[in-house]
UniProtKB/Swiss-Prot annotation:
Belongs to the CutA family. The keyword Membrane does not apply. Keywords: Signal. It comes from the Eukaryota. This is Protein CutA. Homotrimer. Pfam families: CutA1 (PF03091). GO terms for biological process: response to metal ion. The keyword Signal applies. SUPFAM superfamilies: GlnB-like. The gene is CUTA. Residues 1-30 form the signal peptide.
Amino acid sequence: MRRGRAPTFLLGGGAALLLSLFWMPTLLPAASRLLLLPRALLSMASGSPPAQPSSSSRSAYVPGSVSAAFVTCPNEKVAKEIARAVVEKRLACVNLVPQITSIYEWKGKIEEDSEVLMMIKTQSSLVPALTDFVRSVHPYEVAEVIALPVEQGNSPYLQWVRQVTESVPDSSTAPL
């Protein structure tokens, strides 16, 4: 699947929220997205960035040090096999979103498939290794592996992602 690039003016303020409202429609009902639309538009129009957390709630998370990657699989069995393997290799943690519909052009023909979406969180430095591994085990001729840096989020969760994807296992690390 191919999508056009967002114009560069959509990179700051409420633009990220605005873009995300339409980027993952299967995960957020339309009514919920519409309720968030005015906030995104107001933030963009005012030119002010979204409210930042107070210094007491901030931690040592470095923006962009964790990435969210997306991989589509033909079925749940394949998705679970790949997910377990990347977790065992300490490359990532994974959520599976079943029953998505993908519509795309392949070899000159419009295709429509039911797939499973893997939402993968990993250290940004591990994205190349994750991509190589997924490509080596994925059944598709051209596996979808796309990754975006995570600029903000729940710092304890993002720190946990970094812990569970470190190369040396830590016996004190427990999933949340």
